[in-house]
Design a protein with these regions (language model features):
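Acidic active-site catalytic centers that drive phospho-/nucleotidyl reactions
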Residues: 16-17, 55
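Acidic, metal-coordinating helix/loop segments flanking the phosphotransfer/catalytic sites
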Residues: 38-56
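Active-site T/S-Asp motif of two-component receiver
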Residues: 59
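Short acidic/polar segment at the start of the alpha1 helix of CheY-like receiver
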Residues: 18-22
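Charged docking surfaces used in two-component/phosphorelay signaling
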Residues: 23-31
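A generic structural motif
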Residues: 33-36
Length: 59
């Protein structure tokens, strides 16, 4: 197995059209210590990227 990665404080954007998936990812990532920004589509994500400067983007 690989080493555990410390995500504490990482800014993560989750892009998905499913509210259930966005919220599930948010719960998991917040528990891992991440700051989470949610977007429901690419247009929403583009509007938020400039303001939040995420370290990681999941889509």
């Amino acid at each position: 197995m690989g080493e555990a990665v410390n995500l504490n404080g990482a800014k993560v954007m989750v892009i998905d059209d499913s509210n259930t998936i966005r919220r599930s990812a948010e719960i998991f990532l917040v528990q891992a210590g991440c700051q989470v920004v949610l977007a429901e589509d690419g247009f929403d994500a583009l509007a938020k990227i400039a303001d939040h400067h995420p370290d990681i983007i999941f889509c």
